[in-house]
């Protein structure tokens, strides 16, 4: 009984003939038809195309998806006749097929479709190579295999340059949203402080307008600043710095400054 990985490895073995017949490629000499194993790559490429059309607003979306599904079904029939098993097209996607590949150098399972694992220049020429994870082949030469194998294969679908623009837009919106909230809260806090300061100044001004101030008929209590001194701790309890007012009234330093 064949497994999906058996089918994928068969396709990789025949990949150099997938562009045949083509006189420009020396390996195609005498080959009149591409091997049926190449249907695996056709399905994988169609699945990528289907994924892109699935989330578009193009008016031709339904028509295009219908045609893609028909093409996928044709290749699925070819593979069923070849291997005698029913292969789900969803299993033949680039990021899933990667699990089946073997690192020729170490024997470990390869995580991505990188040249050092597959030697797949022929696939690239045929247009079958999937978009590598950000960093491309450079990342596979810069990082050890143990590190690379810790990267979840499924993320290849989302961590590629073609899709990354959407995540960058979302990230930018989140950053702008946070910035907006912080600025709004800061402005509101400053506005409240300014409002309280105006109330304090108004309070002082009203007290100074007493016509009997500094006379025997003064309406203020014996300590003209008593009410003001009682008001300062109230504002300090709300987090305001009242150091200047304390200094003017001869009070000891307080908190929040």
From Swiss-Prot:
Its main location: host cell. Keywords: Host membrane, Late protein, Membrane, Transmembrane, Transmembrane helix, Virion. One of its GO terms (cellular component) is membrane. It comes from the Viruses. It is a multi-pass membrane protein. Induction: Expressed in the late phase of the viral replicative cycle. It is found in: Host membrane; Virion. The chain crosses the membrane at residues 123-143, 163-183. Belongs to the asfivirus C257R family. This is Transmembrane protein C257L. It comes from African swine fever virus (isolate Warthog/Namibia/Wart80/1980) (ASFV). The lineage of its organism: Viruses, Varidnaviria, Bamfordvirae, Nucleocytoviricota, Pokkesviricetes.
């Amino acid at each position: 009984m064949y497994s999906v990985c058996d089918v994928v490895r068969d396709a990789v073995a025949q990949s150099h003939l997938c562009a045949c017949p083509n006189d420009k490629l020396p390996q195609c000499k005498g080959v009149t038809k591409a091997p049926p194993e190449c249907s695996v790559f056709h399905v994988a490429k169609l699945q990528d195309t289907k994924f892109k059309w699935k989330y578009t607003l193009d008016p031709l979306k339904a028509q295009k998806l219908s045609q893609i599904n028909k093409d996928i079904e044709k290749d699925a029939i070819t593979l069923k006749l070849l291997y005698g098993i029913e292969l789900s097209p969803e299993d033949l996607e680039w990021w899933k097929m990667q699990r089946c590949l073997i690192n020729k150098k170490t024997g470990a399972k390869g995580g991505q479709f990188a040249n050092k694992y597959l030697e797949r220049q022929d696939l690239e020429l045929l247009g079958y190579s999937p978009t590598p994870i950000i960093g491309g082949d450079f990342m596979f030469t810069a990082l050890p295999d143990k590190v690379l194998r810790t990267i979840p294969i499924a993320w290849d679908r989302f961590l590629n340059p073609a899709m990354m623009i959407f995540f960058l837009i979302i990230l930018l919106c989140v950053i702008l949203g946070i910035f907006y909230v912080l600025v709004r809260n800061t402005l509101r806090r400053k506005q409240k402080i300014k409002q309280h300061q105006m109330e304090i100044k108004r309070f002082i001004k009203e007290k100074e307008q007493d016509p009997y101030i500094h006379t025997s008929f003064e309406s203020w209590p014996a300590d003209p600043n008593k009410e003001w001194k009682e008001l300062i701790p109230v504002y300090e309890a709300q987090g305001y710095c009242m150091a200047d007012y304390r200094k003017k009234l001869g009070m000891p330093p307080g908190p929040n400054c």
